[in-house]
Amino acid sequence: MSDGKKKLSFLTVISTIICVVFVCEAAAPAAAIGNQQFFWWIFLILTFLLPYGMVVAELGTTYDGEGGIYDWVRDGLGDKWGARISYYYWVNYPLWIASLATMFPDILGMVFGVEFNLIAKIGIDLAFVWIVYLMGRSKAADSEWVLNGGAIIKVAVAVIVGALGIWYAMENGFANDMSAATFLPELTNTNALGYLSIIIFNFMGFEVICTMTDDMADPARDIPKAIIVGGLSIAVIYLFAGFGIGAAVSADSIDPDYGMIYAVQTIVGDSMIFKVICIAFLITLFANMAAWSFGVNSVARYAAEHGNMPKVFTSMISDDDMPNGANLVNAIVASLVLCLQLVPIDAISNGVFWMLFGTSIVFLLLTYIPMFPAFLNLRKNDPNRERIFTFPFKGAMMKVMLAIPCIELILAIVATLIPFSVDEIGDKVPMIVIFIVLLLIGEVVRVVSAKGRETECKGLTPELAAQRLAEESEED
């Protein structure tokens, strides 16, 4: 069907996945796990990425609304959980924007050899936030240059970092012990396990392309293929970049904030290559936030239309149907969060990147847990709907394959938030406080938003599913 609108090509769909899912800033915390990161990457590809990707492929090709994961959870579990995950999905985004904004002043300082004071830093942070806001006002199909360009630059940065790391190791030897034993998981290393959530986080985002179905030429064909091709490509890119970082910098010295940048600086010094990679890295941050804004804003808007998020998220709809109200709220919240840098507590003001980024990750991971039981309910209550792509397991095996990623998500959240040693208390307590406060705010938002709702959806029943199918067939 052609409606005369510009459509996303399959190449752009792949680029969108890479632009959304692959985030350069997450490579360093994963590399901080040490050589055992390779075990965990392979293990989580098999036990998390594959079942998660196949669930998203089935849901995305079966239910093609622009609400994405929100629609799936609402249909599977009802308004209560639909409201919760829409809030979790949304609140992760301004936290993420704010965390990335804090990287800009320091990296610019490395490039130009200057050191910014706190006021100048916050000014640069805010400039990043509001440029992202302006980029988020453009529809996905009209921003192919952002998606394609962002993907190309991200891959280029990762490949260059990996190649430089290998070259450095060949010239100077590996910075880490490369014996076989170091590649096995060390379950007693609680500090390293705290970064496992980063690897799972690095797989998140495939569902964002499912909110762009109206912009795709053939979503039923493109979504499953893009998830498979994009997922495998991203895993290879991460492993290569992580190897490069680990080759040049010892695991216990990798900075979770600027690890990739410091690795390049260790290899090539303050050369022009270093400066170019720094600038390219900063450009990828803009591309990443722009790509995510399309999905996050659509979910927030859809939820608000059902009385599951505040009405402000349905305001300021542009001529090309962009929810600019949601976009504006993102920028305002991110700007306010950045003021935490003014708090005169060292663990907060100096550890702001990981505090915000880690909390963002927790909320994003929390979003996906209800998706798996919702998937089971939709399979049970909507069995007659045509499924172009089908999750390949059935019965008890299917339940096991869905339970494993749920358990991994819960464990990753616990490992990120809970301090398992005295040394972690100072860094993790602020994260716990922010998480609890935002979680409680989310419950208030859910209850208040529901007051304007005339009826409550309890999730699809077999009768409602049959009725919906009949209505859709009449429309066709």
What are these regions (language model features)?
Residues 1-43, 49-57, 63-66, 180, ...:
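Membrane-interface "cap" regions at the ends of multi-pass membrane proteins
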Residues 71-72, 78, 110-114, 228-290, ...:
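TM-loop-TM module centered on a large, flexible mid-protein loop between adjacent transmembrane helices
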Residues 31-32, 51-129, 134-137, 282-299, ...:
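Hydrophobic transmembrane alpha-helices that form the core helical bundles
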Residues 36-39, 120, 148-278:
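Helix-loop-helix junctions that connect adjacent transmembrane segments
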Residues 2-11, 124-126, 217-221, 225, ...:
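Loop-to-transmembrane helix boundary motifs in multi-pass membrane proteins
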Residues 88-102, 203, 208-215, 271-311, ...:
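Membrane-helix boundary/coupling elements in multi-pass transport proteins
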